[in-house]
Design a protein with these regions (language model features):
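Feature marks extracellular polysaccharide-active and adherence modules
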Residues: 4-5, 9, 15, 25-26, ...
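Leucine-rich solenoid repeat scaffolds
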Residues: 62-112
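A subset of signal/propeptide-processing and intrinsically disordered low-complexity segments
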Residues: 4, 21-22, 92
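Short, solvent-exposed linear patches
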Residues: 19, 60-62
Length: 112
């Protein structure tokens, strides 16, 4: 899945799937975002503005540097649960997520 430089109304929901890599970068998403059960090699969720809560759960990636989840502005809560590896900055050079609500579970880690 590649989603770049888009304006999305109604939210983004990705359930399952796999592939070499997936990126959701530089988007404006109205309605929240969910990525649940993805099992590819690498996943990046970077520099998005999300109007609504975001759920990032049950994703298992092959690369130890996968699950880069940084530099997002989230107007809602950020839930991260049961991801392998846990969401992190990685080598993206990104900054912590700006979340107006709560950062829960794995996304409550310092630097995210």
């Amino acid at each position: 899945m590649q989603l770049h430089f888009a304006h999305v109304n109604g939210g983004v929901r990705i359930f399952g799937g796999n592939g070499f890599f997936s990126t959701v970068e530089d988007n404006v998403i109205n309605g929240g975002a969910t990525i649940d059960g993805y099992s590819g090699f690498w996943l990046g969720f970077i520099r998005n503005t999300i109007h609504g809560s975001t759920n990032f759960s049950n994703n298992t990636l092959g690369d130890p540097d996968a699950n880069e989840f940084v530099t997002n502005t989230i107007r809602g809560n950020l839930f991260c649960h049961n991801n392998v590896p846990a969401p992190h900055v990685g080598d993206s050079g990104g900054s912590p997520n700006n979340v107006s609500g709560r950062k829960v579970d794995q996304c409550a880690a310092p630097g995210l």
